[in-house]
Curated annotation (Swiss-Prot):
This is Intermediate capsid protein VP6. Its main location: virion. The keyword Membrane does not apply. Residues 62-73 are annotated as: Interaction with the inner capsid protein VP2. Belongs to the rotavirus VP6 family. Homotrimer. Interacts with the inner capsid protein VP2. Interacts with the outer capsid glycoprotein VP7. Interacts with the outer capsid protein VP5*. Intermediate capsid protein that self assembles to form an icosahedral capsid with a T=13 symmetry, which consists of 230 trimers of VP6, with channels at each of its five-fold vertices. This capsid constitutes the middle concentric layer of the viral mature particle. The innermost VP2 capsid and the intermediate VP6 capsid remain intact following cell entry to protect the dsRNA from degradation and to prevent unfavorable antiviral responses in the host cell during all the replication cycle of the virus. Zn(2+) binds at H153. One of its GO terms (molecular function) is host cell surface receptor binding. It comes from Rotavirus A (strain RVA/Cow/United States/WC3/1981/G6P7[5]) (RV-A). The VP6 trimer contains a zinc ion located at the center of the molecule. The zinc ion is not essential for either trimerization or transcription activity of the DLP. Zinc-depleted VP6 has an increased sensitivity to proteases. The lineage of its organism: Viruses, Riboviria, Orthornavirae, Duplornaviricota, Resentoviricetes. Ca(2+) binds at N266, D286. The N-terminus is blocked.
Amino acid sequence: MDVLYSLSKTLKDARDKIVEGTLYSNVSDLIQQFNQMIITMNGNEFQTGGIGNLPIRNWNFDFGLLGTTLLNLDANYVETARNTIDYFVDFVDNVCMDEMVRESQRNGIAPQSDSLRKLSGIKFKRINFDNSSEYIENWNLQNRRQRTGFTFHKPNIFPYSASFTLNRSQPAHDNLMGTMWLNAGSEIQVAGFDYSCAINAPANTQQFEHVVQLRRVLTTATITLLPDAERFSFPRVINSADGATTWYFNPVILRPNNVEVEFLLNGQIINTYQARFGTIIARNFDTIRLSFQLMRPPNMTPAVAALFPNAQPFEHHATVGLTLRIESAVCESVLADASETMLANVTSVRQEYAIPVGPVFPPGMNWTDLITNYSPSREDNLQRVFTVASIRSMLVK
């Protein structure tokens, strides 16, 4: 993996900097590094592909070295270099694709394709190493079973979940009270509602709670908490729990009271925030507990009182809600997030070449399925293929 990254980094630099008109002295170190890559690769043969519709390709390396000059690089010099660069880039691209479509239930962090296994040999260690990538750094740590740490922007840590629970229900579905939520990606939206606006509740107040367990521990998280759940702020028709009928939800939004958010790790409270909105932080946690109240307004203008009558029919439904969004966090496990395309890169290659479903990943690389059942085997394989995807993205967009 180190060699593959170093190859890709050298090729990217060469493609960007070995251009016509450049002073040789400005790229002499890069050309020496480029020549060392050629010397190391010459005389070797590789084979990639042969899984799904990914074609088998054979690769042979026999390239001349780039020479020295006292002047600027001319068109002939650059053309010679380009022919070599293009072949090497094509090779790295195919090695990456070959690796991204393979998986193993045991030691999935290790190279799985024949070509990458061969590149792991001692003879290729002479290629100049550059391990500045966060992915390659963490791959090395994971390969040695040491603690890793990935920084994510809007991490996709919550499996998709959209549902409701009813604390009070009637066959006619005309006087309901309960909670509905939508968890997806890095965001939780939860709403508590009461058709009667807590008229018969103790102290005219309804209490709601929403608990979300994460599949992996997050640390040093920056979080946004808002006293609203915009996805539940408009009328909708909702299927009943048994699917036999539907019921009408027509929300009127109130501000939640006594809002509290707790971040827990192994059942122990790490951070607690009460009635604090905007930006908050959490040190480390694997569970989020949100609690909030719907309080019937003690004083109402006639217009508001008309919305919340003392008896049925209840045509408008009192609703309070919260939005919690993880803006950034550190996780020991690799995740998909908003700032990278690794999941899309891997998935698109597997789809394009009709790669059969293997023993580790779910069909279509379904992220909700993958993160819901995030086994150690999936974690190892995902870190490997994301690392390879990050290497490929240096050369192929």
